[in-house]
Amino acid sequence: MKYYCNPINVPYRYQFNADPRSTGIQVDREAADPSMICFKGKYYIFASMNLSVWVSEDLVNWESHRLPENLPLYDYAPDARVNGDYVYFCASKKGEVCDYYRTKDIINGPYEKIEGTFDFWDPNLFFDEDGRVYFYGGCSNETPVWGVELDPITMKPLGERIPLISGNPFERGYERMGVDNSIF
């Protein structure tokens, strides 16, 4: 029998910051917002603020592999999606236009850069069976989760982004952002 650990026990980076509640240090993990895919028989985990991708054949044993320098490795909430022979990759950079990348070989590349046209936070690409591509993104209790259809070749929006889901922390307090997010 095999047991799986959730969260998966992989080595990742930490950030050390002054703790605003005391004179000590606050240690935060830097592998948030993971995106996991299965590609060519292996599992891959991409996480925020990491230079690596973790690879496994069995979801138990994981190896870290350094990713190519031309990827946005110090950005947040990476999203990886399989579409045919390609893996598409993007990550969040608030206030800056975010690009997309695609490859047929995650570890060795090359990664083809596809110029983005808008900034986003917490991206999620969806490749539909009918060939259409959709982008969803957002991470706030004050602004909505947005959605837009993208051109499957250029990854450019085919229309305006529209709000899909809006937060309402006064009715659903669990939507409050940050530490201790279950209280106001």
Regions found by a protein language model. Name each.
Residues 1-184:
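Carbohydrate-active catalytic/glycan-binding domains of CAZyme proteins
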